[in-house]
Every structure is written in structure tokens, then in C-alpha cells.
Design a protein with these regions (language model features):
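Residues at or immediately preceding the N-termini of alpha-helices
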Residues: 6, 25, 43, 227, ...
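Structural signal for hydrophobic packing residues in well-ordered secondary-structure cores
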Residues: 17, 21, 36-39, 43, ...
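Short loop/edge segments at beta-strand edges and connector loops
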Residues: 84, 169, 190, 307-309
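N-terminal Rossmann-like NAD(P)+-binding subdomain of aldehyde/semialdehyde dehydrogenases
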Residues: 1-101
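Residue-level signal for inorganic ion chemistry
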Residues: 28, 73, 134, 165, ...
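Rossmann-like NAD(P) dinucleotide-binding subdomain of oxidoreductase/dehydrogenase enzymes
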Residues: 93-229
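ALDH superfamily catalytic-core signature
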Residues: 160, 193-327, 390, 452, ...
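Conserved C-terminal structural/oligomerization subdomain of aldehyde/semialdehyde dehydrogenase
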Residues: 23-24, 220, 318-459
């Protein structure tokens, strides 16, 4: 039986990896430099593609896609030598005379599957980690962002031979064909349903995975919060990419004592950002397609809308919408919204708010607005979540110095900066023993003296 093109591609990458070329630190750095130059050279095309796919302005594209990718590249180039160094560790006395060290080695041929909401950044940032660690890589962008996919294919082709890095475009058929191959590592960003499929396929070959998923990320505002700042930063987090962000504040839990004062401030901040009519705002992103547009519109309960609620299917835009008096049984609380809707739930005690969050799947993010240090400490200690902010939203992921990832239902594994390097490499532990002295304690026959000596060494 003849091999399929995807099978041939995987085989070619295995052969290239076996050559040892990617193990050279200089080669890895050259690859990252080439990628950075290509991104800068294609910046205008990237801007145009993201405008076509999502209606992203050039400013938001640089802030959330191109700029973050370039920053990650710069960070990795500065620190790669340190990340890749052999690390010496202490050796226990029982192993005398010997030395111990760990080395990081690449997995081999990796697969990176990216979503449509940040189609450039969420493909390129994992690629940076894969290349820095010395892997070959097959990239699989989302078919829902075709213009961006096309530009990324041009960038990859300009930088790398396909036996080193290749981009496979297509839809579900191509995704399934890729998952039928044996990879050495799979990195997936997307929804829980497809994440399960990826993990199921990976389990057939015991392939390690990173799953960057999502969930309903709460925003908690207590009575001590700076309400004006909280309103502005919550509006930013919700409106960014029109709410199509895996770490967007999904719903608001607010102290009943300050709810009536806070909501008008939130409405005012939204209007400052997108104007009186967001449907005609040039800075405001649109829904990715009709299917997603209709799904989000279907979550709007007109009886509970206190702000917004209008939509334009022709432009795929939905107004920022606040829904008050929402209950846990409402449709908008049954799934991740992934759009510009904000359900509001008032609480009478922080215990009530924390119980509400903990009775659901672990969120990818949590945001707390509070000036109470004791409450801040309590929330961090009592709620499992991937990552988050105190007195801000979303910006915790905009750094290469902390890992980003989920926990439980919101994902497994993390990346960014050194975490990316570690994710795409295996830590090999080595003990080097001298042959000049060979302690007889461990060898048979065992005696009372050997037993006493072992108890001295191993305690």
C-alpha cells in the first residue's frame, strides 16, 4: 500500500530528526532568528489576514498576536543557551563516589494543532518552544481562519524545509489523518470535545500531550474593589477579540452591596471603548462565522438583557451584552460563551461565590477584584484554576516568565518561556559513577554489617 502524503511527511521528519541536525544549539537559534525575520517581513500580510478572518484591527493584531509572538521569540533567543545547559544536581552519600546531572532532549516529531480565535499567536508560540527544544514539527492551523492559515503557510515555507517544519492545512479529514499518525508529542489548543478526541488518539500510542482547553472563567468583584478600575479592566477582558478568548471573563460574580453602583460604570466603560453602537465600531472584532454568531445569539435572554443585546448577521457583530439576574440554570451558564455576553450573578457572601465556582469544572482563569489581602489569599487557596489576575483580567498570559495552562477540565500542561522549552523536551537524568572505588555494601551475600551500613546511608 502506498503511503499517504501525511505519512510521507511524518517519515521525512523522522529521518531529518534522526540526522541529529536539530540537536545543534546553533541550528535552533538560527531557526528562531529566521522565523522572527519572516514574521517581521510579513507583518502587513498578517494584519490583512486577521482583518479578513476576524475583523481584527492592526493594533489588536500586534497587541495580541504578532507582538506577543515576537516578544516570545526574543525571550527564547536570549535564554535558550541557559535553558539547554546540562544541570548538575547533588548526589546522595549512598552513591559515593559519583556525580549526577540532568540534560534536556527533544521528543522528536511533534504535532501542534491550533484554534481559530488567535490563529497566528496560538500556532506560532508553541512552535517557538518546539524549535527551541530541538524538535521537528507539523503545524495544523484551524480551517476557520483561512486567510491567516495561508499567510502562516507562506512564512513556514520561507523559513524551513518541510522535513523540518511543515504546515498542513485542511479541515476535519486532515485533522483525523494527522491524529492517525504516531507523533512523539502533541500540543493541542481548542475546545474540550476535540481535546478528548486528541487525547484518545494519543493514548493509542502513549503519546504525551499538552491540552490547552477552556471553560467558564469567573470574574469576582467584592465590596472592597476599586469599582471604576474594575469596570474598565473587566470591559477590556470581555471585549478583547469580541469575547472569543479562552481566558475571557465568562461571567460576573459580584457582591450585592456594590452591584447597583458597578453596572452603570461597566456600561459607561464599554461605551468608551466601542462607542454608542458597537456594531459599527472599527476596533471591534466580529464573530468568526455564521455558526458561531448564531450560537452566541441563541444564549441571549431578552428578558434579562440590561445593556446591548443587538446583533447584525450581515457583519457577524454582536453588541456587548450584559444580562442581569442570571441563574445557574440559564442557557448562558451551560457552556463557555466565547462571545461578548456577560451574565451577572449577585452574591451575599464570599462563601456563596466560592461555592458557586467550586461546584463547577475547574476554570482556565479566575479574576478577582478586591482590595482585601486576606480575601485575595483565601480565593487563591480555595479555588483551583489554571491562572488569573488580582485586580485585572487576561494579562497574566502576556509574559514569557510564567507558564500558562489549565487544570482538570480546562487542560493539562503549560507553556510560554522556559515552560515551553520544558514542555517540548524530556529531562534525562544521569548518574556517573567512578570505577576507582566499588563499595561492596549493595552486593550479595547480605550480612548484618551491610544491613547496619545501609541503614546509616538510607535514612
Amino acid at each position: 500500500m502506498n503511503a499517504t502524503p501525511i505519512e510521507q511527511l511524518v517519515a521525512a521528519q523522522r529521518q531529518f530528526f534522526a540526522s541529529g541536525r536539530t540537536l545543534e544549539l546553533a541550528f535552533r537559534k538560527q531557526s528562531l532568528v529566521a522565523l522572527k525575520k519572516a514574521i517581521l517581513a510579513h507583518e502587513a500580510e498578517i494584519n490583512a489576514a486577521l482583518m479578513a478572518d476576524l475583523g481584527k484591527s492592526a493594533t489588536e493584531t500586534y497587541m495580541c498576536e504578532t507582538g506577543m509572538t515576537l516578544s516570545e521569540l526574543s525571550y527564547m533567543l536570549r535564554h535558550l543557551g541557559r535553558f539547554a545547559k546540562k544541570r548538575r544536581v547533588l548526589t546522595p552519600l549512598a552513591q559515593f563516589p559519583s556525580s549526577s546531572f540532568t540534560v534536556r532532549e527533544p521528543y522528536g516529531v511533534t504535532l501542534i494543532m491550533a484554534p481559530w480565535n488567535y490563529p497566528f499567536m496560538l500556532l506560532m508560540e508553541p512552535l517557538i518552544g518546539a524549535l527551541a527544544a530541538g524538535n521537528c514539527c507539523i503545524l495544523n492551523p484551524s480551517a476557520y481562519a483561512p486567510a491567516t492559515s495561508k499567510v502562516m503557510a507562506q512564512i513556514v515555507a520561507a523559513c524551513f524545509p518541510p522535513e523540518y517544519v511543515a504546515l498542513v492545512e485542511g479541515g476535519r479529514a486532515e485533522n483525523q489523518a494527522l491524529l492517525h499518525q504516531r507523533f512523539d508529542y502533541i500540543f493541542f489548543t481548542g475546545g474540550v470535545t476535540v481535546g478528548r478526541e486528541v487525547m484518545r488518539a494519543a493514548s493509542e500510542t502513549l503519546t504525551p500531550v499538552t491540552l490547552e482547553l477552556g471553560g467558564k472563567s469567573p470574574c469576582i468583584v467584592d465590596e472592597t474593589a476599586n469599582l471604576r478600575v474594575a469596570a474598565r479592566r473587566l470591559a477590556f477582558g470581555k471585549l478583547l477579540n469580541c469575547g472569543q478568548t479562552c481566558v475571557a471573563p465568562d461571567y460576573l460574580l459580584i457582591s450585592r452591596k456594590v452591584k447597583d453602583a458597578f453596572l452603570p460604570l461597566l456600561e459607561r466603560e464599554i461605551q468608551r471603548m466601542v462607542g454608542e453602537n458597537a456594531l459599527v465600531c472599527d476596533s471591534y472584532v466580529h464573530m468568526v462565522n455564521e455558526k458561531h454568531f448564531r450560537r452566541v445569539c441563541g444564549l441571549i435572554d431578552p428578558d434579562k438583557v440590561i445593556f446591548g443585546g443587538q446583533a447584525d448577521e450581515r457583519t457577524l457583530r454582536i453588541q456587548p451584552t450584559i444580562m442581569d439576574r442570571v441563574t445557574a440554570d440559564d442557557a448562558v451558564m451551560q457552556e463557555e460563551i466565547f462571545g461578548p455576553l456577560l451574565p451577572v450573578i449577585a452574591y451575599d457572601s464570599i462563601d456563596e461565590a466560592l461555592a458557586f465556582v467550586n461546584n463547577r469544572e475547574h476554570p482556565l482563569a479566575l479574576y478577582l477584584f478586591s482590595e482585601d489581602p486576606a480575601l485575595q489569599k483565601r480565593v487563591l487557596a480555595s479555588v483551583p484554576f489554571g491562572g488569573g489576575c488580582i485586580n485585572d483580567t487576561i494579562v497574566h498570559l502576556a509574559t514569557s516568565r510564567m507558564g500558562f495552562g489549565g487544570v482538570g477540565h480546562s487542560g493539562m500542561g503549560s507553556y510560554h518561556g522556559k515552560k515551553s522549552f520544558d514542555t517540548f523536551s524530556h529531562e534525562k537524568s544521569v548518574l556517573k559513577k567512578s570505577t576507582r572505588i566499588d563499595m561492596p555494601v549493595r552486593y550479595m551475600p547480605y550480612t548484618p554489617l551491610k544491613d547496619r551500613l545501609l541503614r546509616v546511608f538510607l535514612r
